[in-house]
Curated annotation (Swiss-Prot):
It is an enzyme of class 3 (hydrolase). Glycans are attached at residue 289. Disulfide bonds join 497-514, 508-524. SUPFAM superfamilies: Cellulose-binding domain, Concanavalin A-like lectins/glucanases. Residues 468-489 are annotated as: Linker. Residues 1-18 form the signal peptide. PROSITE patterns: CBM1_1, CBM1_2. Residues 489-525 form the CBM1 domain. GO terms for molecular function: cellulose 1,4-beta-cellobiosidase activity; cellulose binding. Gene3D superfamilies: Glycoside hydrolase, family 7, domain. It comes from the Eukaryota. This is Exoglucanase 1. It catalyses: Hydrolysis of (1->4)-beta-D-glucosidic linkages in cellulose and cellotetraose, releasing cellobiose from the non-reducing ends of the chains.
Length: 525
């Protein structure tokens, strides 16, 4: 947490029974609009807002302005135990621009890396899209697609401008945990597949037991408990490298873990927890194409990028494929093809993940935690959208943009980006690139094909690199396309059966019909 101290106003306390919310600084969520689309390609603007994660907020006594947490340490005279700390301390409202470097404009969100405020220096931020004042906006991604624009031109080696989904409670844990009185309005309830133990309040209690300040982060530490849930990394990136990664968990929603049994980054036993901390990642550089993503490359990171991610069902209605493509300069750019022998393809499937783990010699915790099918269960349920900017005190972000492990050069899968292995040291990045920022904008969500219906050059995602005319936009479902039966393979229920550039089966197994959703995507329904 990046602490701030404001010592002039009187606290306005919401409750005196548990983890509190105070208002020495009035909480005003910055507005951020997004678009909800229908199968016909019609999109409706949703006027929404964002909130800041509670871990970044000023935590002080409910009776005044004395810090409960300063630097990376708790005040044990106030916080004698987990429950009394939650009772005596509150998280406060945020001055989004001046303290945290967070600004919005219409459908655009900018997150600045380092912000020097009147009382503190803030590093990084984590924000959530809201549905009203007191709930997070949730998305059910399975069978749908999610699209956004991003500008990573101003974030380099060692930084991560991330957009992802986690299975956290829509109310921030307010209804499940009586000790939590702050809720989603104040950014509570975070969890992810690393089962992070640096969260200050978990399940409505302070994570004070066993808390140890970090040796290389003056603002963070780790406690006895962690908080776990399924995670779908749509976008982890800087201007040198990018990856998208599903992380299944055997327990989908938020759950608390203890000590090394949490697994993940914060524990000595990385794979001991209920979640897969590694996931099954698609990083174009790691998959052999070193000229696809970067400055002046096929996907040019000096310009704004439109990122489209589709979550396609298989014949059984489970998650079958995660497909990615890009739009830039008015044309579709299919995701790069993997050139690793035995790991061909440009999308994530169960078979692709199986082959990648073997080719790279990685521990296959992905399958241990349920693989694509288990990830699909999370995607079928409500997930919360997270947008953040951060540096990495554990491994200098080398796992994203350099060679990792650093002594594994030449080993299949070790080279993930062109950044030097000496890059990404947080103290250096914070000193040398404080004005770095990432901009997310033009968020769109809806059925397959709906979010790109109006985009110039939007063809079949991942199958056609040309520039076909934009699809026809209608307000009703397109008529079913019927074909004459003939020999050959047939697509199962939910599978793709047609579209611009599609080369697979165009007939469906009985009794399903190949139904045109738009010019570039037909599906067996």
């Amino acid at each position: 947490m990046r602490t701030a101290k404001f010592a002039t106003l009187a606290a306005l306390v919401a409750s005196a029974a548990a983890q509190q919310a105070c208002s020495l600084t009035t909480e005003r969520h910055p507005s951020l609009s997004w678009n909800k689309c229908t199968a016909g390609g019609q999109c409706q603007t949703v006027q929404a807002s964002i909130t800041l994660d509670s871990n970044w907020r000023w935590t002080h006594q409910v009776s005044g302005s004395t810090n409960c947490y300063t630097g990376n340490k708790w005040d044990t005279s106030i916080c004698t135990d987990a429950k009394s700390c939650a009772q005596n301390c509150c998280v406060d409202g945020a001055d989004y621009t001046s303290t945290y470097g967070i600004t919005t404009n219409g459908d655009s969100l900018s997150l600045k890396f380092v912000t020097k405020g009147q009382h503190s220096t803030n590093v990084g931020s984590r924000t959530y899209l809201m549905d009203g004042e007191d709930k997070y906006q949730t998305f059910e991604l399975l069978g749908n697609e999610f699209t956004f624009d991003v500008d990573v031109s101003n974030i380099g080696c060692g930084l991560n401008g991330a957009l992802y989904f986690v299975s956290m409670d829509a109310d921030g844990g307010l209804s499940r945990y009586p000790g939590n009185k702050a809720g989603a309005k104040y950014g509570t309830g975070y969890c992810d597949a690393q089962c992070p133990r640096d969260i200050k309040f978990i399940n409505g209690e302070a994570n004070i037991e066993g808390w140890t300040g970090s040796t290389n982060d003056p603002n963070a530490g780790a406690g006895r408990y962690g908080t776990c849930c399924s995670e779908m990394d749509i976008w982890e990136a800087n201007n040198m490298a990018t990856a998208f990664t599903p992380h299944p968990c055997t327990i989908i929603g938020q759950s608390r873990c203890e000590g090394d049994s949490c697994g993940g980054t914060y524990s000595n036993e990385r794979y001991a927890g209920v979640c897969d901390p590694d996931g099954c990642d698609f990083n174009s550089y790691r998959q052999g194409n070193k000229t696809f993503y970067g400055k002046g490359m096929t996907v040019d990171t000096t310009k704004k990028i439109t990122v489209v991610t589709q979550f396609l069902k298989d014949a059984n209605g489970d998650l079958g494929e995660i497909k990615r493509f890009y739009v830039q300069d008015g044309k579709i750019i299919p995701n790069s093809e993997s050139t690793i022998p035995g790991v061909e393809g440009n999308s994530i499937t169960q078979d692709w993940c199986d082959r990648q783990k073997v080719a790279f010699g990685d521990i296959d915790d992905f399958n241990r935690k349920g693989g694509m099918k288990q990830m699909g269960k999370a995607l079928a349920g409500p997930m919360v959208l997270v947008m953040s900017i951060w540096d990495d005190h554990a491994s200098n972000m080398l796992w994203l943009d350099s060679t990792f492990p650093v002594d594994a050069a030449g080993k299949p899968g070790a080279e993930r980006g062109a950044c030097p292995t000496t890059s990404g040291v947080p103290a250096e990045v914070e000193a040398e690139a404080p004005n770095s920022n990432v901009v997310f904008s033009n968020i769109r969500f809806g059925p397959i094909g709906s979010t790109v219906a109006g985009l110039p050059g939007a063809g079949n995602g991942g199958n056609n690199g040309g520039n076909p005319p934009p699809p026809t936009t209608t307000t009703s479902s397109a008529p079913a396309t019927t074909t004459t039966a003939s020999a050959g393979p047939k697509a199962g229920r939910w599978q793709q059966c047609g579209g611009i550039g599609f080369t697979g089966p165009t007939q469906c197994e009985e009794p399903y019909i190949c139904t045109k959703l738009n010019d570039w995507y037909s599906q067996c329904l």
